[in-house]
Amino acid sequence: MALLQISEPGMSPAPHQRRLAVGIDLGTTNSLVAAVRSSIPEVLGDERGRALLPSVVRYLPDRTAHIGYRAQEEAVRDPKNTIVSVKRFMGRGLRDVANIEHSPYDFVDAPGMLQIKTAAGVKSPVEISAEILATLRQRAEDTLGDDLVGAVITVPAYFDEAQRQATKDAARLAGLEVLRLLNEPTAAAIAYGLDNASEGIYAVYDLGGGTFDISVLKLTQGVFEVLATGGDSALGGDDFDQRLLCWIVEQASLQPLSAQDMRLLMVRARAAKEALSESDSTVIDAVLESGEIVHLTLTVEIFDQVTAHLVQKTLAPVRKALRDAGVAPDEVKGVVLVGGATRMPSIRKAVGDYFGQTPLTNLDPDRVVALGAAMQANLLAGNHAPGEDWLLLDVIPLSLGVETMGGLVEKIIPRNSTIPVARAQEFTTFKDGQTAMAIHVLQGERELASDCRSLARFELRGIPPMVAGAARIRVTYQVDADGLLSVTARETHSGVEASVTVKPSYGLADDDIARMLQESFREAEHDMKSRALAEERVEADRLVEATQRALETDGDLLSAEERTAVEALMATVREIATGEDHHAIHAAVEKLSHGTDEFAARRMDRSIKSALAGRKVQELG
């Protein structure tokens, strides 16, 4: 799929000109920026050659901010104003944040997204992330020597619409044009797939500082197709640090601790974890504010024991993603490890044991996502060279649908559909003279609207009054390449239209997604029975209402006995429709339908005679 770049007449770029675009890995622990230079993707370092930028921002009373290494160094003495792992807060409300009691920050539960009180005022996660992105943008422009046309920014595959929109808002605040948001595992697949020209099914296991993603990808003839995704947006290397911190506190009997001591021990815990990637044991030393000395020896065996449940927690989404993709572990050709946390020997062993093969680690796990994003950015900027023609297909994690009569869900876009995608379906009115229709946008796998997640509601007004069933309302669902959903409803006769862009106030946690999927499997039989019952009740209501209208307008076509019989059938349908037996409702509806056949024929005859009244035979010829 070649990309066509169109310029104004006389403004076409010279062949040697390149549009500067970068890939940014906006990470929980560290962030990176990369670009393609001389056809080779590379991570851009700071003035001291350091590739990683710690995702840390410290706010000062003079309303300035320190970003990166300097902020990280100051975190111990000023934990309340030094924000780390802000990615966990993107698009989240206060209720959505796990382990909030261990956080040193003063949170404000603002509408839509939490905020943090700092010495420089109240800051949102969007503003804090923008500080990091602006630093990376400046680094790139200083290194490349010109302004950027845009950036591809990576996000976890399980980021929902609110989290993705927050990321785009942060980029714009930082002065960056977002060319595309790209799933982190997919970015890694670009880096590995294109470099090695490999084809087949791959698993991308991405354990970063604060998020875990698993993607099952099929690479065939230059086409990247995501077969399934899964993960946990609240699980990462930070959780291993947190568990190790708890172990240190338990072993040294340290209670209570000040925020400064807590931050100091967290830094020591992280350093110990990283040291165990290179050696079998390490020593943890710290002097607390009280003068108390902490001196502990940590071995690989102890570390593996206290974090074993976290390692196993990553494998549950792996198993589910493989099931969704219909792939067995031995069918996976290779396993790509992404994220600094995958350097832990326990992770590499667990992944290797599960898939029965040694994971691929020939690219730096800290850099691979940024490199893939840079390659995608270079392509979107129109700089691709011959042989760089490839297509990228992502999927949505949960079905998107609309509520219909009876509280049922009509799925418009099924889960695991490739994005970008647009699907449309036509609906009609239920009552005579209906001039408005409520559109209820839903997400989930269940059959009833009450069991699915509500995303948005809006109304289409101005529908021309018609008999029930005559109006045609075309409802279009469109998911763009960034996973954002827009829904449009249009009445085809008049052209009246209404739409909504879905930006949920609160994010959807990954355990909620897993729960929704598990419930859909567990309740499948019950849901189908509930759907059948609801459908029969809707049909019963429709037929009874239509028959009642017919009696009101043409009841004189029936004898007293015939009308009594029809009304008795209607009463039976109404009574049985309150029950739970959809077979009985169906039978009663059929009986009413057949019992009014003669009435319908007489009404048709009257209608035809009325239409032909006063007209000559020659006029009909």
UniProtKB/Swiss-Prot annotation:
Q: Cite the Pfam families for this sequence.
A: HSP70
Write the record's keywords in alphabetical order, separated by commas.
Answer: ATP-binding, Chaperone, Nucleotide-binding
Which GO MF terms are attached to this record? ATP binding; ATP hydrolysis activity; ATP-dependent protein folding chaperone; unfolded protein binding
Q: Which domain of life is it from?
A: Bacteria
Gene3D superfamilies, A to Z: 1.20.1270.10, 3.30.420.40, Actin, Chain A, domain 4, Substrate Binding Domain Of DNAk, Chain A, domain 1
Q: Would you identify the family this protein belongs to, as annotated?
A: Belongs to the heat shock protein 70 family.
Spell out the HAMAP family in the cross-references.
HscA
Function summary: Chaperone involved in the maturation of iron-sulfur cluster-containing proteins. Has a low intrinsic ATPase activity which is markedly stimulated by HscB.
- Indicate what this protein is called per its UniProt record: Chaperone protein HscA homolog
Gene behind this chain?
hscA
